[in-house]
């Protein structure tokens, strides 16, 4: 199988060649931990891509949110079009975890909405890891959560080959055993249907279907096909086999399930006896009723709501043993890349404690067995022990990464020649009037402004005041979802408005070359939002523009300000010296506007589609549904999940309205 093949029109420049060489050599020498300290806009992702090509290791990239993960996924997919680049994040569009509030005696049942396309991408990631070595998986912290055993997932897969003897009923049973459902009407992922001697399977992790044609009890022909058009894509040759992987990550052979059910019953008996001995009759009755219902559902259907809470029994783990996460699907020699490590590592650290705190009340009050504790994310120590080799990527790595790393590789020079922005300190008195003056000067030049405040109230008041002053301004806060955030940034770049006000959302991952001025209000208020690392990250937002500058409004120079200025000036001097030596004139980055995730509002899409449908015949409406399905699959393939979801809802509306 071919290895990683980097495809790019660009050659490494500035500090990139040296960073690539040092990191690659460090990995080849067996260094376990390294830091890539790369300034904003220095091309850290391109550097990492080159390192992956050099060392040829399966790679897991962890980002601290879905937005950054999607951005990295798109970039790596462009760099490695001939390799398996996968996306593994939480598949919930909406998630309300199960919880119990003792103070008000309120039980909150688990409620969730699963994004089917992201679920497919998760399954595709594990499939690629089992089948090949040239795999990059871009993930959020979902990668440390329990997803079941890779050995069972591999062992339960259905392998088919032309000429094999297999009865229809046996094949149906094998598919149902790995969570496929029979559906002779709709071509839904994770389903199969039968027409005479032809069985069509729609794998949960693929966009194509598998057509199995039987002659008696013998497989006569196997081919892949387009689920929308039904046309054959490719025929599986006689010597080759095709593997149909389970439709869910949690799977188990029947004999193992019987053993697991016995283990659950034994734990139930022990816990009920404990509750009764403590005279907690209500809790014991509640636990008995709930657990026995779950056991009956598992016996009859092979599944129950909340089955993951019994995963320790199904996996054969002992109490306290680490769960099987995505990391178990990687080979031992994998490479780990942690993006924005100063944020991502604390996030990984916090996952386990938060999960345990929520389950404590559920277990104490008889809603769950104690084994529910073991359906959990990895602790940080468990995660750390699973690391083979790691690169921590950040413009401001934390003391932890710096302390455990054998090498810190700096990437200070940007390929564009851009230098870190000039930073000015101005008094807090009259900071708003001064800010307005600077905004007007910057706006006249056709540039944009970012303003960061300390509190939500201050951001709202400032936005309102700037609007009264005739300034085109928007406010971005934490309640804004990912899609709307992307649209706000796009509108800022397009010049729909000139100033964006925020609190903590204007730091990592905000790439806006049009921004020439960053204002940090109340910069002298020591704390998380005005720490050395936060200040450096925020100031870095002006580093993609050749005319970029920063103003810190402060009544005094704090230790954080002093340290941030010292580091920024150090980097700036290195960059200026490099440019002078090589005759480089800094040029503002010219970055094309990305397509909008959703081109029209949802309501407009629905009314437009239904309005058109009113004038069509039944056959034309059916054709329209087929076209919309093809468009939905294309949108999902391009990671335009919100558009795909809108199209999916349009299709449902059409089917319901016209009884299709």
Curated annotation (Swiss-Prot):
InterPro entries for the chain: Helicase/UvrB_N, Helicase_ATP-bd, Helicase_C-like, P-loop_NTPase, UVR_dom, UVR_dom_sf, UvrB, UvrB_inter
Binding site for ATP: 38-45
UniProt motif (Beta-hairpin) ranges: 91-114
GO cellular component terms given for this protein: cytoplasm; excinuclease repair complex
SMART domains reported in the protein's UniProt record: DEXDc, HELICc
Top-level taxon: Archaea
Domain UVR: 622-657
Gene3D superfamilies attached to this UniProt entry: P-loop containing nucleotide triphosphate hydrolases (3.40.50.300), UVR domain (4.10.860.10)
Alphabetized GO MF terms: ATP binding; ATP hydrolysis activity; DNA binding; excinuclease ABC activity; helicase activity
Domain Helicase ATP-binding: 25-183
Location(s), subcellular: Cytoplasm
Domain Helicase C-terminal, chain residue ranges per copy: 431-593
Xref: Pfam families: Helicase_C (PF00271), ResIII (PF04851), UVR (PF02151), UvrB (PF12344), UvrB_inter (PF17757)
Keyword annotations of the record: ATP-binding, Cytoplasm, DNA damage, DNA excision, DNA repair, Excision nuclease, Helicase, Hydrolase, Nucleotide-binding, SOS response
One GO-annotated biological process of the protein: nucleotide-excision repair
PANTHER family hit by this protein: UVRABC SYSTEM PROTEIN B
UniProt comment concerning the protein's domains: The beta-hairpin motif is involved in DNA binding.
Similarity-based family: Belongs to the UvrB family.
Subunit structure: Forms a heterotetramer with UvrA during the search for lesions. Interacts with UvrC in an incision complex.
Its job: The UvrABC repair system catalyzes the recognition and processing of DNA lesions. A damage recognition complex composed of 2 UvrA and 2 UvrB subunits scans DNA for abnormalities. Upon binding of the UvrA(2)B(2) complex to a putative damaged site, the DNA wraps around one UvrB monomer. DNA wrap is dependent on ATP binding by UvrB and probably causes local melting of the DNA helix, facilitating insertion of UvrB beta-hairpin between the DNA strands. Then UvrB probes one DNA strand for the presence of a lesion.
Protein name (database record): UvrABC system protein B
């Amino acid at each position: 199988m071919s290895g990683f093949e980097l495809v790019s029109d660009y050659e490494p420049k500035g500090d990139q060649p040296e960073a690539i060489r040092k990191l690659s050599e460090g990995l080849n020498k067996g260094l376990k931990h390294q830091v890539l300290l790369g300034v904003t806009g220095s091309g850290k992702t391109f550097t990492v891509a080159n390192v992956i090509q050099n060392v040829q290791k399966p790679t897991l990239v962890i980002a601290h949110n879905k937005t950054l993960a999607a951005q990295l996924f798109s970039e790596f997919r462009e760099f490695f079009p001939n390799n398996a680049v996968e996306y593994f994040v939480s598949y919930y569009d909406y998630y309300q975890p199960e919880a119990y509030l003792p103070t008000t005696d309120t039980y909150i049942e688990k409620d969730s909405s699963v994004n089917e396309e992201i679920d497919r991408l998760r399954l595709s990631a594990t499939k690629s890891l089992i089948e090949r070595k040239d795999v990059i998986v871009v993930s959020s912290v979902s990668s440390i959560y329990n997803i079941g055993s890779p050995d069972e997932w591999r062992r339960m897969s259905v392998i088919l080959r032309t000429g094999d003897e297999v009865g229809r009923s046996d094949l149906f049973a094998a598919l149902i055993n790995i969570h496929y459902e029979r559906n002779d009407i709709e071509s839904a992922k994770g389903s199969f249907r039968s027409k005479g001697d032809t069985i069509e399977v729609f794998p949960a992790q693929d966009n194509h279907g598998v057509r199995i044609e039987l002659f008696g009890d013998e497989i006569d022909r196997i081919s892949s096909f387009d689920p929308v058009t039904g046309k054959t894509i490719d025929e599986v040759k006689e010597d080759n086999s095709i593997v149909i992987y389970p439709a869910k990550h949690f799977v188990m052979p029947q004999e193992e399930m019987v053993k697991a059910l016995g283990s659950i019953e034994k734990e139930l008996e022990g816990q009920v006896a404990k509750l009764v001995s403590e005279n907690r009759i209500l809790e014991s009755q509640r636990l008995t009723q709930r657990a026995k219902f779950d056991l009956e559902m598992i016996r009859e259907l092979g599944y129950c709501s909340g089955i993951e809470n019994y995963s320790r029994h199904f996996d054969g783990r002992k109490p306290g043993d680490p769960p099987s996460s995505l990391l178990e699907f990687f080979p031992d020699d994998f490479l780990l890349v942690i993006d924005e490590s100063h944020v991502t590592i604390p996030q990984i650290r916090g996952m386990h404690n938060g999960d345990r705190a929520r389950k404590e009340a559920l277990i104490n009050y008889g809603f769950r067995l104690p084994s529910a504790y073991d359906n959990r994310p990895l602790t940080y120590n468990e995660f750390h022990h699973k690391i083979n080799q790691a690169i921590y990527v950040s413009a401001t790595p934390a003391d932890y990464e710096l302390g455990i790393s054998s090498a810190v590789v700096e990437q200070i020079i940007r390929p564009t020649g851009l230098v870190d922005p000039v930073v000015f300190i101005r008094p807090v008195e009259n900071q708003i009037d001064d800010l307005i003056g600077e905004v007007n000067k910057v706006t006249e030049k056709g540039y944009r402004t970012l303003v960061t405040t300390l509190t939500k109230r201050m951001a709202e008041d400032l936005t309102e005041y700037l609007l009264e002053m005739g300034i085109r301004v928007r406010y971005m806060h934490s309640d804004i979802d990912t899609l709307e955030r992307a649209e706000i940034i796009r509108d800022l770049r397009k010049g729909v408005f000139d100033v964006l006000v925020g609190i903590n959302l204007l730091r990592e991952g905000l790439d806006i070359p049009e921004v020439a001025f960053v204002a940090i209000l109340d910069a002298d208020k020591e704390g998380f939002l005005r720490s050395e690392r936060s200040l450096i990250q925020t100031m870095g937002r002006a580093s993609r523009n050749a005319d970029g500058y920063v103003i810190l409004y402060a009544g005094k120079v704090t230790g954080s300000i002093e340290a941030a200025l010292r580091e920024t000036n150090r980097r700036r001097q290195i960059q200026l010296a490099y440019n002078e030596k090589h005759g480089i004139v800094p040029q503002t980055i010219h970055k094309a506007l990305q397509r909008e995730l959703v081109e029209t509002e949802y309501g407009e899409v629905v009314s437009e589609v239904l309005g058109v449908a009113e004038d069509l015949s039944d056959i034309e409406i059916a054709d329209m549904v087929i076209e919309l399905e093809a468009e939905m699959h294309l949108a999902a393939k391009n990671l335009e999940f919100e558009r795909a979801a809108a199209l999916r809802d349009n299709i449902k509306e059409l089917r319901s309205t016209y009884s299709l």
